[in-house]
Amino acid sequence: DLAYVPLIESAFKPTALSRANARGVWQFMRATGIENGLAADWYIDERADPQKATVAAAKYLKTLHRMFGDWHLAMASYNGGPGRVQRAMKRSRIDDFWDLTSSTRFLPRETRDYVPMILAAIIIAKNPAQYGFDILPRTPTPTEDVTLPAAVDLRRVAEWAGVAVDDIQQLNP
């Protein structure tokens, strides 16, 4: 079910960049991405790599779940940060997500609304026809991971592969 988090975070867009500089399908902040094994420097930013970012997000969500012992609080802390959620729990003396969000005093609106949006996305995604969505199944385009020993101009890669540069860029956010 957590696979639907990127639907809310980024609409599954690898190139998504928030006002706060969170990046990729999982919208990792730079420091959080690095803490969870993603490279982010002047040369490469793995937050935009859907495969690597998904592995990092699974690791991070598992850490948050261990920290809070509850998936709703883990998801809230994925959005608002674990420190913010811990402070809200301490100030309110409440350790249940729904009770914590019943007041506007402890967590910002974005974090209070985040878990219900994820849960709604899960319900709709599992029953699209029931909610008026006619989704046709698509077969993913086969791709292959290729690691190059050095930086290469994507125009040359596109030429070698016989595809458009835009296609190469889309596969290499």
Residue spans of the language-model regions?
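Proline- and acidic/polar-enriched loop/turn elements at helix boundaries
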Residues: 4-7, 17, 45, 170
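Extracytoplasmic and endomembrane cell-envelope/extracellular-matrix remodeling and assembly machinery
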Residues: 35, 39-67, 72-173
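A short structural micro-motif
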Residues: 9-14, 81-84
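Export/targeting segments at the very N-terminus of extracytoplasmic proteins
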Residues: 1-11, 55-64
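Short, surface-exposed glycine/acidic/tryptophan-bearing loops
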Residues: 16-37
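A local structural micro-motif
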Residues: 1-3, 13, 41, 166
